[in-house]
């Protein structure tokens, strides 16, 4: 990948009007090196083969509903596995609310969590755009 594709996370947050759910985590030096996004549905089931943890990770209705179907303990373990995999950040779309325990876990793992009011597909399209010559 050439260096021009990377973008500061803070620029993406500003451009996409993301609400920072973990403001105590400093994102000023965080760069997104892969101009793509990922919906970690398979990873939330425990499948991490071929997982590209350099991508911005998105939680939409499908992932959120799946996680809500799990027990609190299982849900925490799935988030722990995802947040421990050194992802740059996690974005909840459609105004979905991350649970307080998950926010605490994110702070512990130093993985910022954001919230977007946009539909998941719209967010994905715009998120991919910042890596395709459209500056964030």
Where are the regions that the model predicts?
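Gly/Thr-rich phosphate-binding loop signature of adenosyl cofactor/nucleotide-binding cores
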Residues: 1-82
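Feature captures the catalytic cores and cofactor-binding loops of soluble hydro-lyases/lyases
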Residues: 49-58, 62-135
